[in-house]
């Protein structure tokens, strides 16, 4: 059974250094450690959940990444990338963020085999194993194979157009796409769907045991193959950057489930923390004071 004693493992294929720049030069540039898995681990730690993040890092930017990560005291296991760790630029223009993402580093097959060997030696059947980010498809296939062989609690938040084919009938414990990703995955011929059509698509989606879908400023959906819950978003105090909001939603939701909260309670906390992330640069951390606000929810 999945519970607070379950170890959390996060495979973040290619972490990054996020460089926030103000287009109007009203504030200095800010460097933060980035990557979906890093963001998740930071917010999960706020609830006493300490994941281990596995990633690939390459010089000359590896050392800078590790220096930026040090204040968060995360458990990180890195494997060698042949080329440098990415630097992604987040250009801020009022409430708008333009992202200029560097190319994914080159990762040799030997390094992937080393990561797989580490997972096989450490992941237990009741552990939670999260794969997130963008993978080279060759490596994603291998990591999916090993993930499903090690634990029944596999969580996927990956950017892969052919994910359904790669799953090959295997059912993750949870998937977390955003609305656009979900619609493209199940209804590729028509990306323009209204809420009624979206609800029907969700209820027909049997690829995963649980679906957590973020819908931007509208809120989030959770479907467990029996009930479909919709939680309205909390309006952020201010719009600074949406970077990391989806990672926060997933990380906080999982952390609260591990602490034995029900899905409604877990999602309430998660949408509050996602809103707080939008109100600042990078994700919320231990320096932030989060006041939980009531939010509306209903079953569809």
UniProtKB/Swiss-Prot annotation:
One of its GO terms (molecular function) is 1-phosphofructokinase activity. Transmembrane segments: none annotated. It catalyses: beta-D-fructose 1-phosphate + ATP = beta-D-fructose 1,6-bisphosphate + ADP + H(+). It is an enzyme of class 2 (transferase). Signal peptide: none annotated. Disulfide bonds: none annotated. GO terms for cellular component: cytosol. InterPro entries: Carboh/pur_kinase_PfkB_CS, PfkB_dom, Ribokinase-like, Tagatose/fructose_Pkinase. Keywords: ATP-binding, Kinase, Nucleotide-binding, Transferase. The active site is at 247 (proton acceptor). ATP binds at residues 214-219, 246-247. Pfam families: PfkB (PF00294). Its EC number is 2.7.1.56. PANTHER family: 1-PHOSPHOFRUCTOKINASE, 1-PHOSPHOFRUCTOKINASE-RELATED. Belongs to the carbohydrate kinase PfkB family. This is Putative 1-phosphofructokinase.
């Amino acid at each position: 059974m999945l519970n607070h004693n379950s170890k959390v493992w996060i495979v973040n294929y290619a972490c990054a250094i996020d460089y926030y720049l103000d287009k109007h030069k009203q504030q200095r540039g800010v460097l933060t450690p980035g990557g979906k898995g890093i963001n998740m681990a930071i917010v999960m730690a706020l609830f006493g959940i300490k994941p281990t993040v596995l990633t690939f890092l390459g010089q000359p930017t590896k050392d800078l990444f590790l220096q930026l990560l040090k204040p968060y005291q995360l458990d990180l296991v890195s494997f060698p990338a042949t080329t440098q760790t990415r630097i992604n630029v987040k250009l801020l223009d009022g409430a708008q963020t333009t992202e200029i993402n560097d190319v994914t580093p080159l990762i040799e097959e030997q390094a992937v085999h080393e990561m797989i060997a580490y997972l096989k030696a450490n992941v237990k059947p009741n552990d939670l194993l999260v794969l997130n980010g963008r993978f080279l498809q060759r490596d994603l296939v291998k990591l999916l194979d090993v993930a499903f062989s090690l634990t029944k609690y596999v969580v996927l938040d990956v950017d892969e157009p052919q994910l359904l084919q790669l799953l090959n009938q295997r059912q993750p414990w949870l998937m977390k796409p955003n609305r656009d990703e979900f619609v493209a995955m199940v209804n590729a011929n028509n990306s323009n769907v209204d809420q009624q059509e979206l609800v029907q698509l969700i209820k027909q989606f049997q690829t995963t045991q649980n679906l957590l879908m973020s819908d931007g400023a509208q809120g989030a959906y959770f479907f467990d193959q029996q009930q479909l819950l919709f939680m309205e978003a909390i309006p952020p105090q201010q719009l600074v950057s949406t970077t990391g909001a989806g990672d926060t939603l997933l990380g906080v939701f999982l952390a609260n489930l591990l602490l034995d909260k029900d899905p409604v309670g877990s999602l309430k906390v998660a949408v509050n923390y996602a809103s707080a992330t939008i109100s600042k640069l990078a994700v919320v951390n231990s320096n932030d004071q989060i006041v939980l606000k009531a939010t509306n929810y209903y079953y569809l």
